[in-house]
C-alpha cells in the first residue's frame, strides 16, 4: 500500500514537472516567434499588406498561446498548493500538536493563577470573618 502511494506521488510530481516544462517552453517559443515576426524582414510572394495582415494574425494567435500557457502555469501552482495542503499530514499534525500543547500550557497557567486568587480570597475572607465576629461593633 505504501509503495503504491509513493509511486502515485512520484507520478504526480513527474506530471507537474512535465506540465511546467511544457508551459514554459510554449511561452518561450511563442515569444521568440513574435519577436521574429516583429522584425518584418521576410521576403515572400505576397504583397506587403497581405504579409502584414498574416503576421498580425499570427502574432495574435501566439500571444493567445502565451496567455494560455500562463493560465496553465497558474493552475499548476494552484494544484501544487492544494496537493501540499491536502497531503502534508506530517506538518499539519505538528501544527495541531504544537498549538494544543500551547493551549494546554496556557490553560494550566490560568488554572494556577485562578487557584492562587482563590486561596488569597479565602484567606482574606477568613481574616474578615474573624475580625467581624471578634468585633465589639457587630
Swiss-Prot record:
Keywords: Activator, Nucleus, Transcription, Transcription regulation. InterPro entries: Med22. Pfam families: Med22. GO terms for biological process: regulation of transcription by RNA polymerase II. Disulfide bonds: none annotated. GO terms for cellular component: mediator complex. It is found in: Nucleus. The keyword Acyltransferase does not apply. One of its GO terms (molecular function) is transcription coregulator activity. Belongs to the Mediator complex subunit 22 family. Component of the Mediator complex, a coactivator involved in the regulated transcription of nearly all RNA polymerase II-dependent genes. Mediator functions as a bridge to convey information from gene-specific regulatory proteins to the basal RNA polymerase II transcription machinery. Mediator is recruited to promoters by direct interactions with regulatory proteins and serves as a scaffold for the assembly of a functional preinitiation complex with RNA polymerase II and the general transcription factors. PANTHER family: MEDIATOR OF RNA POLYMERASE II TRANSCRIPTION SUBUNIT 22. Component of the Mediator complex. This is Mediator of RNA polymerase II transcription subunit 22. The lineage of its organism: Eukaryota, Metazoa, Ecdysozoa, Arthropoda, Hexapoda.
